[in-house]
């Protein structure tokens, strides 16, 4: 256990290939498990929550998990809690899935609007209309890696370096090398 007074960190990487990592239930469960190990205060709250759900034999609802997280964030005198949601755009955006991206966005909006004194959030995502619509009004600080000037230039520099320093560079005609560079930059799509 960590002592009270030290910051806590919980992160969640959204992954469309893993059902447990693309929705609200997985996100909340992951945050709570990580926080459980970081402070005696968190331990007590989460252990009580676990006991209320028959020691894990009765799965909690998403609403119950969200309320437990809010209870942790409301504990008095705690140091900052950093919650990181990485690759939010990988959360499924289809209503047939139990917990969709819209539910995760709703939770983020709710947590930010509640203005918990100790909450710090970082959300990463590719630009998507539904995500931008919810997050833009909430953002205190935004860093875009999708602008044409920065990331694309880095990718272009790297591709040129690799092709121009390749041992078989002399085998290619200059126009073919330039065409290969142009196609690779275009197809990289910022990745």
Predicted regions, residues:
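Conserved NB-ARC/NACHT P-loop NTPase core of NLR-like innate immune receptors
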Residues: 1-191
């Amino acid at each position: 256990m960590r002592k009270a007074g030290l910051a806590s960190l919980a992160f969640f990487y959204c992954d469309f290939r893993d059902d447990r990592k693309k929705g609200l239930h997985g996100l909340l469960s992951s945050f709570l498990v990580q926080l459980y190990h970081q402070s005696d205060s968190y331990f007590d709250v989460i252990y009580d929550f676990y006991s209320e759900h028959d020691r894990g034999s009765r799965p909690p609802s998403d609403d119950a998990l969200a309320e437990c997280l809010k209870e942790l964030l409301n504990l008095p005198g705690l140091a900052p809690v950093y919650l990181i949601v990485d690759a939010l755009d990988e959360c499924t955006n289809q209503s047939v899935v139990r917990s969709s991206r819209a539910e995760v966005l709703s939770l983020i909006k709710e947590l930010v609007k509640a203005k918990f004194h100790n909450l710090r959030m970082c959300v990463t995502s590719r630009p998507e209309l539904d995500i931008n619509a919810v997050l833009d009004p909430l953002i205190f600080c935004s860093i875009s890696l999708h602008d044409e000037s920065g990331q694309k230039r880095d990718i272009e520099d790297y591709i040129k370096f690799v092709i121009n320093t390749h041992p078989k560079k002399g085998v290619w005609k200059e126009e073919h090398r330039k065409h290969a560079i142009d196609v690779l930059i275009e197809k990289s799509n910022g990745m």
